[in-house]
Amino acid sequence: MSDLNDVQENAKLNSETRNTGKAEPPHGTTEYVAEAEISKNGVGSPKKSPKKGKVGKGDNNKVETELVHTALLEKDNPFMEEGPTGFTKSALLEIPGMRSHNLKNPNEDYEDDSEGLLPLNQESNAETCRTSLSGSINSMNGETSASEEPSVSNRKKSARIHILEAKRVSEGQGRAYIAYVIQFENSTVQRRYSDFESLRSILIRLFPMTLIPPIPEKQSIKNYGKSITGSSSKYLLPSEGSGSVDLSLSVIHASVNNSDEKLIRHRIRMLTEFLNKLLTNEEITKTSIITDFLDPNNHNWHEFVNSSSTFSSLPKSILQCNPLDPTNTTRIHAMLPIPGSSSQLLLNKESNDKKMDKERSKSFTNIEQDYKQYENLLDNGIYKYNRRTTKTYHDLKSDYNEIGEVFAQFAHEQAQVGELAEQLSYLSNAFSGSSISLEKLVGRLYYNINEPLNESVHMATSARELIKYRKLKYLQNEMIKKSLNSKRAQLEKLEAQNNEYKDVDKIIDNEMSKSHTINLERPNNNTGSGGKSYGGKLFNGFNKLASMVKDSVKYQETDPHTASINLKKEIEQLSESLEVTENDLEVISKVIKNDQLPKFSKEREVDLSEILKHYSRYMRNYARQNLEIWKEVKRHQDFA
Amino acid sequence: MENDKASHASPSIGVNEFVVQGEISIDDSERSVKSVSVSISDDEDSKTDVQDNMATPSTRSKFQTDLAIDNRLLEKDPKYKKLFTEKRRRRRPESCINLMTKGKGTGQKDNINDQIFSLRILPGSDLNSLKDSLWIIKISTQPDVEKTIARAFSDFYWLYHQLQNNHWGKTIPPPTRSNILVEKDEFAINHLFMIRNNEKYDPIFNFKPEYIISLQLMAMIKHIFNDKVLRLDSNFIDFISWDDDLPESLQIVVDDSTFTGDKILMTSSQFRELKEFHKQSKKVESITNSHASLIPVTELTEIYISPTKLFSRKDYQRLFQPQSTDNTFNNNDPLIQEWIPKSKTLFTSLSFGSSAPTYQEASTEIQACHDWVSISKEQWKQLLYHVLQYIVDEAVKVNSVINEFTECLKQISLDEVIRANSELFLKFSKLNESFLKKFKGASRQDILKLIILFDENVRFCESFESILNQRLKLGKILSIIEVDLDKKKNFLDKLSPGNNNSNNEDLKIRTAEDEYRIVLKRYNRVKQSWEKIMEDILNERKEFEKREAAEVNSCLKSIRDLNMDEKKHYLQLWQDFVPDEHISQ
């Protein structure tokens, strides 16, 4: 039965990949070109129109949810709406998503009917699934960065996830949690933090060789329950300008303290970034997990996960997963050992012995050290000093504000001297203006510089997790090697023992023959009575000894044979495991070293350059505003 | 019974009283003439006292009359004889010095119409205890004539109290803020002394409190020099030890351009001069009865008022020290016995009990001055504090953070982990370095002058408060005189109904009327000076506002210009940063 389930799952994945492959080629190129034309014509217009479209589609989605009562209606609705949507908005990228989403439903029905397929067809489907996955990996390796970046930017422009609202929801028994309302394209869905956590753990097991973006740390529900109480009120979060997560649409639907508001805002930002980064990952978007997570029909994510056979069949540990296809975990993968923390000592010992493994571990150790140093530089360097700079500017803003107030008060009191009062009022306006511009700068630095740097630190931590995964795989391989060697040594010992036993038998036979000759010599010496009695005793001893030896030989012959058979089976099994783990390790090392880490390093370099670009832009705007303020003061002075 | 008392009176006593009346009338007429004159005449008198040989023809008669008065005083009391003779002996060598310098002075005057004096005050000892610290005053003119004087910090306070006591209604800024001395104001002390002790701060900003105090002392002396009335005071001339004539068109320039912070050691001659000045100041206090040295330094707003400034010695003794009348008046005289009040607490001291007369401010302008000075003082303090904090935050904290950030960026650019962005980080660190170089000490000196200006204004407000308090005390004294006048008038009313004994009663009435007239004249004189003080106060406020407006205006203009230049450079830095970034990409 488990084999049949695996086959069905493979068939599903295969069908999904085929569908996505079919859907993209005929429409993708034309739509990209169309979008490029739209962007060339006007900068602001494409941004505004999708939002309006989204709002309209949201209403349609609500209508759909209200109308849906049975599966039959669910089938009929896409067919009815497919026509007008196709005609009206054929140029948008949203249509292929809709089509793929609609096309999945009949395919699922088709898969349900495929239970009666022949075994040969099942096997062929499994093989094609493997080849397709490997092909996709090869194609990913072959892609160039130049072609990759435009697609990412296009997708970013076309579809972005927004968290519109964070509100308190009670689940009975005095417990409550924060629900985040997520908007994607034309649908909205509510998810709680544990749903995001579950999604991330599933993605880590599904895509062990992929860098999964981080999510903020877990906070206690009790603290939330205490802090978020009372009547509901809306806190509209301010926008922090361009080049970052746009939180202008987000609303905190609860009465919260300032610190809790910051915490929730931070969570909203991190979760939004998490989902948007998942959308940019092509390998993940090939599967339907993201769309399932964002599907409003799946009200309860945990129920969806438990009911899904694909997710429930995944092994608990990523080390027991097949890195190429975690859903197709073989018996060999299931029996792999899981290394503990003490196995690192073994690694150190083993690495001293073998040069090849030593070289491999050295290169990855260097990589790990580099990423650790990178994380340290980000955390203790740029992030730390930017935070200190932001705090210092904040204090300076307060000082400017106080000076402005004092000058204004002084100007008001010194009304007798008109000229001085006028100039003091202008100067107080200048200081107040500087305070306001500095406040904007502080806000921008905090939201668009410090928090992205914090995210970069977390991303570096995720990269180190990948390296750790590879390291654990290596330890696993070493454990298998060690056990295999020990088994072989045992087998050799058994064979050696068998040989020794044969030699002993030969010696004993020879001695028995010798004793026979002695027996022949005795009748010749039987002249006296004393000689007769002595010869008889010796013969009896030899007979007893020979009988004992024969018995022992018979006993040992059966046991070594059984042991050798068992050892051979184990050796064969371990050899297969070793082969599998070596292949997996090779694939993992190759993918991580040549694909994931270079991709991550490029992304981080782009992020850092963007952060510095924004930093210089903010500083330039701040300087320009300051200059305008003081120019105005001088203008007033010259006029007076 | 009254007839019996009258019969006991002898004609000789009556004749003596008549003679005494004549003396009093003569003194009163002279002083009434003085009271009519303006304050310049008082300065002229002091000027003639300082320089005997320089008397002008117009003041010869006054000079002679003064000499006559002095002679009479010398005849009566031997103490005064010693003091004045010593004073004259001390002035003889000065006259020789004057003769020597006259030629030079006349020569210089021919060349230069307006003389410019540069003033500089430097610390002469460590600032462990500010009260005991020593300061060196250097006054130099353009023809390279320099005068160096050594004075203790307490001498500045002595001068402050003497001038304040001699010139009512004139504001003299105190030497330095009282808060620093008594350590009440923690904020100011922490910022001033923390800046010195903290080694992280750059040397330009690391100015010392000696510098601030020297600027404050220079501001005080400059203020006195610029006032044509105050600079002619004998106490100030003794303080400066000035022997030449001070030209009327004198201008004082404070030399605060450079300050190395090195203390200048005092020479033995300067130390000897300092001791002599202390002795002289004690003598002056004893002569003028000002008690300047006894006043605690912390009580800046309380000015001691000497009643002898208002009244003659006889009237003072009669009004405020009844017990001392035994020497001059006969206790057996029935008229005098009746005049002395029964309760002595009213006149024994200036500290009033529950029966003290109440005084209320009648002038709305003076009341407005009271309100104005308290508000202004608080506002200047707030400005001072906030500007100090602004300097510390912007000039110190921001620069230190950027400095460390620059070092961190350099380290990152050298690291191999981030290779693609190393050039970008290097340029970013260079930007921060150029920022630190350009904006490190640019607007620091200017803001420092603003701080000193605010501090000077705070001290002016304190001095103004002292003037107002002085006037309040004077109002209380006027109340005392009014009470005295009422009593005298009641006494006259009692005597006037009796008409039987014409000879005896006429004599009594005339003596009472004479006394009443004398007291009334003194009251009018004092009240007139009181009104004059009010006018001086109002004028002082106007002058302060004008001077303040001019100084603050010039200071704000320079701040504005410097801020504009700073913002331009700042904008230029970030504009230059962007094209490099594009090139690197």
UniProtKB/Swiss-Prot annotation, chain A:
Pfam family, one: PX
Record region (Disordered): 1-63, 126-156
Keyword Glycosyltransferase belongs to the record: no
Keywords: Acetylation, Autophagy, Coiled coil, Endosome, Lipid-binding, Membrane, Phosphoprotein, Protein transport, Transport
Impact reported for Y193A: Abolishes the intracellular punctate localization and decreases the cytoplasm to vacuole transport
Annotated GO MF terms: phosphatidylinositol-3-phosphate binding
Location relative to the cell: Endosome membrane; Preautophagosomal structure membrane
Membrane topology recorded in Swiss-Prot or TrEMBL: Peripheral membrane protein
Organism whose genome encodes this protein: Saccharomyces cerevisiae (strain ATCC 204508 / S288c)
Protein name as catalogued: Autophagy-related protein 20
Gene Ontology biological-process annotations: autophagy of mitochondrion; cytoplasm to vacuole targeting by the Cvt pathway; early endosome to Golgi transport; intracellular protein transport; macroautophagy; reticulophagy; retrograde transport, endosome to Golgi
Function: Required for cytoplasm to vacuole transport (Cvt), pexophagy and mitophagy. Also involved in endoplasmic reticulum-specific autophagic process and is essential for the survival of cells subjected to severe ER stress. Functions in protein retrieval from the endocytic pathway. Required for proper sorting of the v-SNARE protein SNC1.
Extent of Polar residues compositional bias: 1-18, 126-153
Curated annotation (Swiss-Prot), chain B:
GO cellular component, one term: cytoplasm
GO molecular function, one term: phosphatidylserine binding
Highest taxon, organism lineage: Eukaryota
InterPro entries xrefs: AH/BAR_dom_sf, PX_dom, PX_dom_sf, Vps5_C
Span list, region Disordered: 27-59
UniProt xrefs under SMART domains: PX
Example GO BP: regulation of TORC1 signaling
Note: Present with 1270 molecules/cell in log phase SD medium.
Name of the protein this chain belongs to: Uncharacterized protein YKR078W
